[in-house]
Amino acid sequence: KMFYPQAKPNVIHEKMALFAKEKNACVITQNVDGLHSKAGTPQNDLVEFHGSLYRVFCQKCGRSIEWSKYLEDMHHEGCGGILRTDIVLYEEPIRREVLERAVEIVSNADLIVVCGTSLAVYPFAGLIEYASKDAKIVAVNKEKIPLPENAELIIGDAKEVFEEVDLKK
């Protein structure tokens, strides 16, 4: 079972959505669960690097289909084509426009917050290399991860760290 529409955003999703709405921030996520959207991150400030389970298209005609239709039948009732979720599967390439948008965001950021990733899987892990030398990089993770020398690493539970974040400061 891939779909959990009852899943709710946690404090990390909620604070990131607030950052996007109030602080001119963008979110680049590897998650395909749609929780950043559900938390209210504006779509123009969100890059779902590996796609979303909640976007479905027909592989034959290319039309977008409501995701709930995919749960009923894997075939497009219009043309008979096979439906597919808009996610990047293992060894598939990232869509060019997604990669370019992510690189643009990282290149122009003055603050980069890395959260909940090992930074071991490329091309996502390579995005950090596009950060400007003046950008502040802060990572929150339960264990040490490879980061540029100028980055600050907070080792701990990301939910606990984000609960302490105050956007008014």
Over which residues does each language-model region extend?
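Conserved catalytic alpha/beta core of Sir2/sirtuin-type deacylases, generalized to analogous enzyme cores
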Residues: 1-169
